[in-house]
A protein has these predicted regions:
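Patatin-like phospholipase
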Residues: 1-209
């Protein structure tokens, strides 16, 4: 058994359809020989086939990571190759789930995940457009300080504790985003759209009233 990396332009025209079928053959289904050979989905050998693109001279690549089992082929990446990765934190359903509604949802998630990367949106499970400075984010976090609570203790003990709990790295703005996401998830706020940070804050405040 070996991996086959082929180019459409190098294939005889009467083999193109067979090779497209071969690239999507899933071993849980009954396999049929194509051209006298058995093939299986290339994702079982390399879930992110960057090697084929790099060896064919592509320098700027947008790679989409999809969660699941599989192997990533390791090879030396040339210094002049730029790769932008798009990944998701959402549950996309099973590989063999052919439900139309799930497929439409996955497509929508894909667009949102791409926008997160390409437009610099914030959030892990929500898609948030930034409008606040780091100082404004800190002030908003300080607004949650209860009357009489020690300010230094809040900044040096409580906020770092929250950051660790929410796995929030970076500055105060990123900590605020993690807090907002946590609150939004608990309140069942829809995450299938883009929010401006101030809009999400207002949405959460309205939900508490």
């Amino acid at each position: 058994r070996k991996a086959l990396e082929g180019k459409v332009n190098d294939l005889p025209e009467d083999q193109i359809c067979d090779m497209l079928l071969a690239s999507a053959y899933h071993p849980t289904f009954k396999l049929e020989k194509l051209g006298g050979k058995f093939y299986t989905d290339g994702g079982f050998v390399d879930t992110l086939p960057l090697h084929a693109l790099v060896t064919n001279g592509y320098k700027d690549i947008i790679a989409v990571r999809i969660p699941g089992i599989g192997h990533n082929r390791r090879f030396r990446m040339p210094d002049d190759v730029n790769i932008t990765y798009i990944a998701t934190n959402a549950d996309l359903g099973g590989v063999l789930n052919f439900d139309a509604e799930q497929s439409r949802r996955d497509i929508a998630i894909g667009y949102l995940d791409a926008k997160r990367v390409l437009y610099g949106l914030y959030g892990k499970h929500y898609y948030i457009e930034r409008s606040m400075t780091d100082r404004e984010a800190l002030n908003m976090l300080l607004d949650s300080l209860e009357t009489g609570e020690n300010l230094r203790q809040f900044c040096e003990r409580d906020l770092p504790r929250v950051a660790r709990h929410l796995d929030a790295e970076g500055d105060y703005y990123e900590l605020l985003i993690a807090v907002l996401e946590d609150a939004a998830a608990k309140q069942g706020v829809d995450n299938m759209r883009i929010y401006k940070d101030t809009e999400l804050v207002s949405r959460l405040e309205e939900s508490r009233e």
